[in-house]
Amino acid sequence: PSTTPSASPSGTAEPGASSKPDATKAPAGNDKDDNTGGSTVKVKVGKKVTVNSSKYKVTSVSGTRAVQFTSGKKNAKNVVIPATVKISGKNYKVTSIANNAFKNNKKLKKVTIGVNVNKIGKAAFKGCKNLKSIIIKTKKLTAKKVGANAFKGINKKATFKVPKKKVKAYKKIVKAKGAAKTVKVKK
């Protein structure tokens, strides 16, 4: 194995934000669809990695590989929490959003939550007063899996776009988790 770390172009990195590769693993099999923002690090549970200016924490490396979204680019106005991210040539499902992930982010206006997210942490979007558009692609959220005050303090005119069969259930969840009664939940 080569000792030279391989790097993929990922735009401008924040100082100290990128993880140093401990060992470079060659991608297994035919990973020809390598995304340009992938990260190459020694992967273990609890490891924090940065992919495309967003930070993740590895939650599972065996069976279904999974990560938790911990934070996005500091002053981003539009954030997409993807279905998967590529780390060391392997795909990891993004299954959760950390507590306080975007708390008090005044710049954030739009968030897209990927199809594999099944948990949103406490106060994840609390105080994001300019957050007006939330697209939820996942069908896996329940009241127990969305933390307290997850949507408290978002824009009172915010619109949630959710899967067709989840409009009624998600309307109850977002309002129970702090969103104003004036927010709209639609398909």
Identify the residue ranges that each predicted region occupies.
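N-terminal segments that cap or nucleate solenoid repeat domains
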Residues: N35-K90, T95-K106
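A structural signal for leucine-rich repeat
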Residues: K126, A148-G153, K172-K177
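Polycationic, low-complexity disordered segments in secreted or periplasmic proteins
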Residues: S18, T24, K44, K48, ...
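Consensus positions within tandem repeat domains that build extended binding/scaffold surfaces
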Residues: N99-N100, G121-A124, G147-A150
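Intrinsic disorder/low-complexity signature
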Residues: S19, P27-K32, G72-N75, F102, ...
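Ser/Thr/Gly/Pro-rich low-complexity, disordered linker/stalk segments of secreted
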Residues: P1-K44
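Structural signature of tandem-repeat unit edges
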Residues: K20, T64, K74-S96, K106-K119, ...
